[in-house]
Amino acid sequence: MKHQLNSVKKFHEVYKLNYSEKPITDIGLDTIKLRFNLMDEENKEYFEAAKNNDLIEVADALGDMLYILCGTIIEHGMQNKIEEIFDEIQRSNTVSYTHLTLPTIYSV
């Protein structure tokens, strides 16, 4: 994940886009709206691509989603914490689902 985050950070540096070296929440309402709208657009593109069984467009949407997510992570200055955050979510999810069987999970 560090490679992807560093690549997007370089993009932000070249194009004078914001990023933070420390965790922050206040990135400005305009940036929050932009990040939300970019992710929303890619989610919709993914939905259409998956619904239409278009593997190339699914891959494109997933790649764009990852790129936008990396940009959002570095805007919030969480690039040095995101793997730890992910690991904690993984641990929590694993504990949450240990009592469920696969048929139970997929019947929700």
Region locations from a protein language model:
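Conserved small/polar residues in nucleotide/adenosyl-binding loops
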Residues: 98-104
